[in-house]
């Protein structure tokens, strides 16, 4: 009987761990190549998640493209329209890369300039483990790039975007030949069955 109860306990725990955590909001990025669902970690990167959700809720990402795609590295978007003109953004946020999250395949992180605290709306999804992007120390060279979530559905779409042929356009390199556009970005409400 003890073995049966222990087995049942493990089974129940396993089922619960496969469901979404209600404290982790999810965002759907509908692109012209398919939909990517991202789970966010406000407990690890509160300012970054708040910033990202503000852009999502404002409809900012609709019509933006993945403007930088590098095979075996990452796909980057969230700042340019199909005309390769940057969209006006809110002020930069503090870099929360020292949160313990790593730039592993399928994670989403904030893009920025060489200044550590310069991220606004642009983000990237890692298509491989990119350890060199992780936080090392609080210097300009060591700050790293803040991971604030991960892809939970649609990694095949990320891979399809990564496989696009690229070119140089409007002074930018690694731009997909055919625009990969975010049609819509929105928060997803989880059903009671999905939340435990």
What role is predicted for each listed range?
Residues 9-196:
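Cyclophilin-like peptidyl-prolyl cis-trans isomerases
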Residues 1-5:
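Bacterial N-terminal signal peptides that target proteins for export
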């Amino acid at each position: 009987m003890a073995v049966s109860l222990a087995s049942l306990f493990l089974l129940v725990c396993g089922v619960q761990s496969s469901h979404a955590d209600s404290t982790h909001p999810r965002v759907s990025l509908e692109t012209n190549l398919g939909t990517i669902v991202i789970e966010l970690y406000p407990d690890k990167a509160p300012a970054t998640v708040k910033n990202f959700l503000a852009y999502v809720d404002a409809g900012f990402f609709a019509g933006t493209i993945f403007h930088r795609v590098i095979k075996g590295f990452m796909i980057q978007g969230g700042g340019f329209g199909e005309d390769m003109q940057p969209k006006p953004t809110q002020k930069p946020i503090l870099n929360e890369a020292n949160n313990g999250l790593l730039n592993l395949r399928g994670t989403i992180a904030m893009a920025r300039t060489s200044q550590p605290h310069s991220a606004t709306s642009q983000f990237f999804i890692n298509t491989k483990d990119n350890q060199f992007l992780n936080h090392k120390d609080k210097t300009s060279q060591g700050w790293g790039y803040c991971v604030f979530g991960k892809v939970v559905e649609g990694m095949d779409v990320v891979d399809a975007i990564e496989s696009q042929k690229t070119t140089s356009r409007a002074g930018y390199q690694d731009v997909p030949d055919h625009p990969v556009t975010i049609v819509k970005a929105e928060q997803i409400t989880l059903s009671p069955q999905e939340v435990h």
